[in-house]
Every structure is written in C-alpha cells, then in structure tokens.
C-alpha cells in the first residue's frame, strides 16, 4: 500500500515539475498565441473602423485604435495624428457628438469667453458718433434689429414733440383785446367795408336802368351827395308807381345787373362793327360805279 502511494506521489511530481526546455517552449507558444490573438483584434478593429458609418463619433475610433497593444507603424502614426488634432482642436468632439452639447462645461465656457472678447473688440472700434448716442448702441450682439428700433423710437419721439409743439401753438389762448383796441379794430373794418360799398355804388350809377335806385347798404360821402342830387331831380319828375314802390338794391343785385350791362355792351359792339363793315363795302361799290 505504501509503495502504491509513493508511486502516485512521484508520478504527480514528475507531471508537475517540467524540465526547463519544456517550460521555455510552453512560454513561447503562449506568447505566439497572444500575439496572434492581438493581431486578429487589430485587424478586426481596423475593419470595423473602416466599415463604420460617417457619423460614428471620433472618440470610439480613437479608443478602438489605441486599445490594441501591437499594430503597424501606419496605424500608430494615424493614431498619434488623431491625438494631436484632438489636443489642438478640442471642439471636434463637441461637434462629433451632439449629445455632449449640453454636458460640456469647458466648451460652453470657451464660447462665452469668445463672445465676451468679441464684445470688447466691438466696443473698442465703435465710432464717436455712436458713443455720443448710447440709446442707439446695441449691447446684445445677437439682436441686430434693436438699433433700428431705437432709431425709429427716436424719430417717433421727435415727430411727436414737433406735433405737440404745433398743437400747443394752435391751441394757444387768444389774446383778449382791450376796449380801446376793439374800438379801433371796429373802425378799421367799417372803413374797409364802406370803401367796397362806395365802389359798388359807383358801378350802380354806370348802369342806366338801376342808376336812380337806392342802395340797401352804407356808402361814402361822395356817393351820398350824388344820391341827394338825384333825389332832387326825381322829386321834380314824378316816377311811376312800380319805381316808387321798388325795393332797395343790395350788392349781389348790383353786380348781377353790371354783368348784364357788360354783355349788352359787347353785343352792341359786335353789331356796330358789322354795320361799319357793311358801310365800307357800300362805299367801295359806289367808287367803282363812278369810275
């Protein structure tokens, strides 16, 4: 029994303890298998990267390429160039992955800093005319329509002030005249009215069929004297009942009679011209008969 146990122990020790040459061979076989597996992984990763769609994020491509332990020099150069570009341009990851727009504090802070820098640069290059009018300067770079709105508001306010000034001028209370000024104003108006009335009364005296009639308005002293002289002559000569009971003439009636008289004179002038032409033709015929 003891001999059997000794044999089993020896056989197990022989199986566990291997020679050094066999151990080296086994280690080389393991390394070859691992390298073969890594090469297969690299080839599969390259194929998957080449077959990926155009919108695949750049992070996945870089991570798949960097996960391989053994690769070709071209792949290493490609990976290093991608790493350099990602270091120089960190916003590529931002644009490649739209879901990271709201979860990237670094990018948002950089954008805010750029906007602040742009605002400062625009403020430095503003002309003096805009600096004198702060209401027309746009503080928000995104809203381009506010300067136009401010300009329109300024124009509207200017127009409103002008209209208000005109209304106040029109609505200004009229100055009240003193009693002396009122009396002088009334005298001037009366004199102006009497001058017009006297001219119309003289026109009435020219018209033969209304010259002897009385007027219904006030006239000057010169016309009154002539009316008195005409009244004395009319008293000596009796007038018919129709003329005695006739109403006084107003200004419109006198002007109407004046127009009728002018037309009457024009017609008479044409008739006289025709008569003159007829007489001239008769004289010419008589001279020819005498010859």
Swiss-Prot record:
<keyword id="KW-0805">Transcription regulation</keyword>
<keyword id="KW-0010">Activator</keyword>
<dbReference type="GO" id="GO:0006368">
    <property type="term" value="P:transcription elongation by RNA polymerase II"/>
</dbReference>
<dbReference type="GO" id="GO:0000785">
    <property type="term" value="C:chromatin"/>
</dbReference>
<feature type="modified residue" description="Phosphoserine">
    <location>
        <position position="104"/>
    </location>
</feature>
<keyword id="KW-0539">Nucleus</keyword>
<dbReference type="InterPro" id="IPR036638">
    <property type="entry name" value="HLH_DNA-bd_sf"/>
</dbReference>
<feature type="region of interest" description="Disordered">
    <location>
        <begin position="221"/>
        <end position="245"/>
    </location>
</feature>
<feature type="compositionally biased region" description="Low complexity">
    <location>
        <begin position="233"/>
        <end position="245"/>
    </location>
</feature>
<dbReference type="InterPro" id="IPR011598">
    <property type="entry name" value="bHLH_dom"/>
</dbReference>
<dbReference type="GO" id="GO:0043565">
    <property type="term" value="F:sequence-specific DNA binding"/>
</dbReference>
<dbReference type="GO" id="GO:0005634">
    <property type="term" value="C:nucleus"/>
</dbReference>
<dbReference type="Pfam" id="PF00010">
    <property type="entry name" value="HLH"/>
</dbReference>
<keyword id="KW-0597">Phosphoprotein</keyword>
<comment type="function">
    <text>Transcriptional activator of glycolytic gene expression, such as enolase genes (ENO1 and ENO2), glyceraldehyde-3-phosphate dehydrogenase gene (TDH), phosphoglycerate kinase (PGK1), phosphoglycerate mutase (PGM1), pyruvate kinase (PYK1) and triosephosphate isomerase (TPI1) genes. Binds DNA on E-box motifs: 5'-CANNTG-3'. In response to adenylic nucleotide reduction, activates Ty1 mRNA transcription, possibly by controlling Ty1 antisense transcription. Acts as a cell cycle transcription factor.</text>
</comment>
<dbReference type="GO" id="GO:0046983">
    <property type="term" value="F:protein dimerization activity"/>
</dbReference>
<dbReference type="GO" id="GO:0000978">
    <property type="term" value="F:RNA polymerase II cis-regulatory region sequence-specific DNA binding"/>
</dbReference>
<keyword id="KW-0238">DNA-binding</keyword>
<feature type="binding site">
    <location>
        <position position="193"/>
    </location>
    <ligand>
        <name>DNA</name>
    </ligand>
</feature>
<dbReference type="InterPro" id="IPR052099">
    <property type="entry name" value="Regulatory_TF_Diverse"/>
</dbReference>
<dbReference type="GO" id="GO:0045944">
    <property type="term" value="P:positive regulation of transcription by RNA polymerase II"/>
</dbReference>
<dbReference type="GO" id="GO:0045821">
    <property type="term" value="P:positive regulation of glycolytic process"/>
</dbReference>
<feature type="binding site">
    <location>
        <position position="185"/>
    </location>
    <ligand>
        <name>DNA</name>
    </ligand>
</feature>
<keyword id="KW-0804">Transcription</keyword>
<feature type="modified residue" description="Phosphothreonine">
    <location>
        <position position="237"/>
    </location>
</feature>
<protein>
    <recommendedName>
        <fullName>Transcription factor TYE7</fullName>
    </recommendedName>
</protein>
<feature type="region of interest" description="Disordered">
    <location>
        <begin position="89"/>
        <end position="109"/>
    </location>
</feature>
<dbReference type="GO" id="GO:0003700">
    <property type="term" value="F:DNA-binding transcription factor activity"/>
</dbReference>
<comment type="subunit">
    <text>Homodimer. Efficient DNA binding requires dimerization with another bHLH protein.</text>
</comment>
<feature type="binding site">
    <location>
        <position position="189"/>
    </location>
    <ligand>
        <name>DNA</name>
    </ligand>
</feature>
<dbReference type="GO" id="GO:0001216">
    <property type="term" value="F:DNA-binding transcription activator activity"/>
</dbReference>
<feature type="domain" description="bHLH">
    <location>
        <begin position="180"/>
        <end position="265"/>
    </location>
</feature>
<feature type="compositionally biased region" description="Low complexity">
    <location>
        <begin position="96"/>
        <end position="109"/>
    </location>
</feature>
């Amino acid at each position: 029994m003891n001999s059997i146990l000794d044999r089993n122990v020896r056989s197990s020790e022989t199986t566990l303890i291997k020679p050094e040459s066999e151990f080296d061979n086994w280690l080389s076989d393991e390394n070859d298998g691992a390298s073969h597996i890594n090469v297969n992984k690299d080839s599969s990763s390259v194929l998957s990267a080449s077959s990926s769609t155009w919108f695949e994020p750049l992070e996945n491509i870089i991570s798949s390429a960097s996960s391989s332990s053994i690769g070709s020099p071209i792949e290493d150069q490609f990976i290093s160039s991608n790493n350099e570009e990602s270091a120089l341009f960190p916003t590529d990851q931002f644009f490649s992955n739209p879901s990271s727009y709201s979860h990237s504090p670094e990018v948002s802070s950089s954008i805010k800093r750029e906007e602040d820098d742009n605002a400062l640069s625009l403020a430095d290059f503003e002309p003096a005319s805009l600096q004198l009018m702060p209401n027309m300067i746009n503080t928000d770079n995104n809203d381009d329509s506010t300067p136009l709105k401010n300009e329109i508001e300024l124009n509207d306010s200017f127009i409103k002030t002008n209209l208000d000034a005109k209304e106040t001028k029109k609505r200004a209370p009229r100055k009240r005249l003193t009693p002396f000024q009122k009396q002088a104003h009334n005298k001037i108006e009366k004199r102006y009215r009497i001058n017009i009335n006297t001219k119309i009364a003289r026109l009435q005296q020219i018209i033969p069929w209304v010259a002897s009639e009385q007027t219904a308005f006030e006239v000057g002293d010169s016309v009154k004297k002539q009316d008195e002289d005409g009244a004395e002559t009319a008293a000596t000569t009796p007038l018919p009942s129709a003329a005695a009971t006739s109403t006084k003439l107003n200004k419109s009636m006198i002007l109407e009679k004046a127009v009728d008289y002018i037309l009457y004179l024009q017609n008479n002038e044409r008739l006289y011209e025709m008569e003159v032409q007829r007489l001239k033709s008769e004289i010419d015929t008589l001279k020819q008969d005498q010859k």
